[in-house]
Amino acid sequence: MNYLVMISFAFLLMTGVESVRDAYIAQNYNCVYHCARDAYCNELCTKNGAKSGSCPYLGEHKFACYCKDLPDNVPIRVPGKCHRR
């Protein structure tokens, strides 16, 4: 039984783990991408590795691109202010 656990763990380490998340994609300085159409967000999100994107008009950030299944290496909007220069 222990061998099975060790082999499974080794296989997991060899293959790597890629996780995804649903979030607002962020520009520099923690700013969202503003939008007016779903097509713009869908193109932006899929170009960055997401499954799809939309431009919701309700929610925390109104008229901002929201991506489904966005990879971990792409920046997302985190709590705090947008710090534009």
UniProtKB/Swiss-Prot annotation:
Residues 84-85 form a propeptide. One of its GO terms (molecular function) is toxin activity. The keyword Signal applies. GO terms for biological process: defense response. Disulfide bonds join C31-C82, C35-C55, C41-C65, C45-C67. It comes from the Eukaryota. It is found in: Secreted. Keywords: Disulfide bond, Ion channel impairing toxin, Neurotoxin, Secreted, Signal, Toxin, Voltage-gated sodium channel impairing toxin. Residues 1-19 form the signal peptide. Expressed by the venom gland. GO terms for cellular component: extracellular region. Belongs to the long (4 C-C) scorpion toxin superfamily. Sodium channel inhibitor family. Alpha subfamily. Alpha toxins bind voltage-independently at site-3 of sodium channels (Nav) and inhibit the inactivation of the activated channels, thereby blocking neuronal transmission. Shows a high toxicity toward insects and moderate toxicity against mammals. Exists in two forms, due to cis-trans isomerization at 28-Asn-Tyr-29. Adopts a predominately cis conformation. This is Toxin BmKaIT1.
